[in-house]
Each structure stands twice: as C-alpha cells, then as structure tokens.
C-alpha cells in the first residue's frame, strides 16, 4: 500500500477532523481520483505524435491512456468531429496514491524555476487543477528518447465540499502551495 495512503488514514483524517469539527470519519474529504490529460492538437497532421504522447502518458501513469476525439468540427483549427486530438488517463485507488506521492515528492520539485503551485486553482468544489509545461519532470520519461516536449493537465478530484476544505486536504499532504 502507498505510504501516502497510510499517512492519510493515520494523520490527515485526525488533523482535518479537529480543524473542521466533523462528527464522522466519513465527512473528512479524501482524494477521489486524479485525471491526467494531454492535448495533442498537432496530431491532425501527424498521427505518430499522438502515439508518442500516449506512450509518455502510459509511462507516467502506469496504465493505458484513452484517446480523446474532437466533439465537434472547428474550421479555424482544421479539425473535424471524431478526429483524435489527445489522450487522458483517470487514476483511482492504489495507482492514484502512488502517482500522487511521486507528483508531490519527485516531479513537482523538478519543475524549472519552481516557486510553488498557485493556491487559486480550485474550482469552487474542492477540486484542484494544475498544468505542467513539460512531461520530462517525471522520472519515468527518458529525456534522450523524447521527440517533443509536451505539457499535460493534472486534475485532483476530492470529496471536499468547499475550496477551503480541499486546500486543507492538499496542504496536509505537504502540497507545495505558493506562499
């Protein structure tokens, strides 16, 4: 079992119960899922780019990504409905906790010119979204084999009811928020 999950059950739950005066352990917010999304708009011209992006996402997440397709045609972007334009992965359970641990302890500190993550990226319901400009911050990606530096979106979905609860949950995991 992931160390971060044990830490959540042993320490974070107690900390949040006292901070927000919850009556039951089930009221304490928890991390529900982590979604990784990589948009590859250039895939319209070259299908190999999407395969490489999917391979990178599979290496980062540890599971096969789902190819996302365009919902509608947009002439300005030269895409038609149904064209493959990206890939995404939804992590839950054990893989989610392992990825979350790697994200906090290894990947985020490797971001170039890192000064902390914005504490304003919550959506109003306790979910946190962040963007990563280059996938090479993850140790699973071999820098020499990367054909193109790509970014990805990471969304951490929690059961928190408000941004304050979500912020307290992530801060309890020592999430590196900007001061």
Curated annotation (Swiss-Prot):
BP GO annotations: translation
Gene Ontology molecular function, alphabetical: rRNA binding; structural constituent of ribosome; tRNA binding
Gene3D superfamilies, per the entry: 3.30.1440.10
Keywords from the named record: Ribonucleoprotein, Ribosomal protein, RNA-binding, rRNA-binding, tRNA-binding
Pfam families hit by this protein: Ribosomal_L5, Ribosomal_L5_C
Protein role: This is one of the proteins that bind and probably mediate the attachment of the 5S RNA into the large ribosomal subunit, where it forms part of the central protuberance. In the 70S ribosome it contacts protein S13 of the 30S subunit (bridge B1b), connecting the 2 subunits; this bridge is implicated in subunit movement. Contacts the P site tRNA; the 5S rRNA and some of its associated proteins might help stabilize positioning of ribosome-bound tRNAs.
SUBUNIT field: Part of the 50S ribosomal subunit; part of the 5S rRNA/L5/L18/L25 subcomplex. Contacts the 5S rRNA and the P site tRNA. Forms a bridge to the 30S subunit in the 70S ribosome.
Family that this chain belongs to: Belongs to the universal ribosomal protein uL5 family.
Protein name: Large ribosomal subunit protein uL5
Phylogenetic placement of the source organism: Bacteria, Pseudomonadati, Pseudomonadota, Gammaproteobacteria, Enterobacterales
